[in-house]
Amino acid sequence: MSDWDLGELNALEKAQQTAALAAVNQQLESQTAEQRVAWALEHLPEQAVLSSSFGIQAAVSLRLVTRQRPDIPVILTDTGYLFPETYRFIDELTETLGLNLQIFRATTSPAWQEARYGKLWEQGVEGIERYNQLNKVEPMNRALATLGAGTWFAGLRREQSGSRAHLPVLAIQRGVFKLLPIIDWDNRQVYQYLTRHGLSYHPLWEQGYLSVGDTHTTRKCEPGMSEEETRFFGLKRECGLHEG
């Protein structure tokens, strides 16, 4: 697998582009997470960045990638509505792992948004999507542009939801290469990695949370609920960051 140029890839016919990505993904599927990170850092364009929601398993990807690129910018899109435990977890991991944390927020404050639009998360799917566009998608797009990102690492896993079940290791999203090093990991592998390296789950894991986002759209997992139903009142699984 040689160096990849996004411009050259985008210049290909759609069928050729799809075939090229499929060929490299076939090889990446057989590699370990560490090997995927190493390959991406060697062959994909700079600037490499890593996004994190600092959720339940966040420490895995943060350690995995920063072990090979200690100063990689770590992008957090802060909505202003994260749990207090999340903010403390961010501080803890930033200090423990020496993260180069880059925080991006909406251009309008949470209070001003509520004054202007009301509580968007209580306005059905349309309101949730508008909220996510303002507080997650636009700040992420701005982060990628500001940092000059060419390669984007993220910690998604196929096991997490139906919407992620068929994601490839490598794709093109928002005009950059996107690599998912632990896409094929299961919960057991996450646990083993955290234990082996003395890292912790998000503090709310012990209280029954399987997925953690904003305080107003995250629920503790109850008997009979799927992980997908604990976010956005079960109306959506994705916040928009990893779509499109």
From Swiss-Prot:
Question: Could you tell me which InterPro entries the record lists for this protein?
Answer: PAPS/APS_Rdtase, PAPS_reduct_dom, PAPS_reductase_CysH, Rossmann-like_a/b/a_fold
* Reaction(s) catalysed (UniProt annotation): [thioredoxin]-disulfide + sulfite + adenosine 3',5'-bisphosphate + 2 H(+) = [thioredoxin]-dithiol + 3'-phosphoadenylyl sulfate
Q: In which pathway does it act?
A: Sulfur metabolism; hydrogen sulfide biosynthesis; sulfite from sulfate: step 3/3
Q: Please give the name of this protein.
A: Phosphoadenosine 5'-phosphosulfate reductase
Instruction: One GO cellular component term, please give it.
Output: cytoplasm
Gene name for this UniProt entry: cysH
Its keywords, alphabetically, are: Cytoplasm, Oxidoreductase
Q: Which domain of life is it from?
A: Bacteria
Q: Which family does the entry's similarity section mention?
A: Belongs to the PAPS reductase family. CysH subfamily.
What PANTHER family does the database record attribute to this sequence? PHOSPHOADENOSINE PHOSPHOSULFATE REDUCTASE
Biological process terms from the Gene Ontology for this record are: hydrogen sulfide biosynthetic process; sulfate assimilation, phosphoadenylyl sulfate reduction by phosphoadenylyl-sulfate reductase (thioredoxin)
Q: Where in the cell is it found?
A: Cytoplasm
Cite the active-site annotation. 239 (nucleophile)
What organism does the UniProt record list as the source? Answer: Sodalis glossinidius (strain morsitans)
First-level EC class: oxidoreductase
- SUPFAM superfamilies hit by this protein: Adenine nucleotide alpha hydrolases-like
Against Gene3D superfamilies, the record matches this protein to: HUPs (3.40.50.620)
Q: What does this protein do?
A: Catalyzes the formation of sulfite from phosphoadenosine 5'-phosphosulfate (PAPS) using thioredoxin as an electron donor.
Is-annotated flag, keyword rRNA processing?
Answer: no
Q: What is its main location?
A: cytoplasm
Asked if the keyword RNA-binding belongs to this entry, the reply reads: no
* Single GO term (MF): phosphoadenylyl-sulfate reductase (thioredoxin) activity
Q: What is its EC number?
A: 1.8.4.8
- Pfam families for this protein: PAPS_reduct (PF01507)
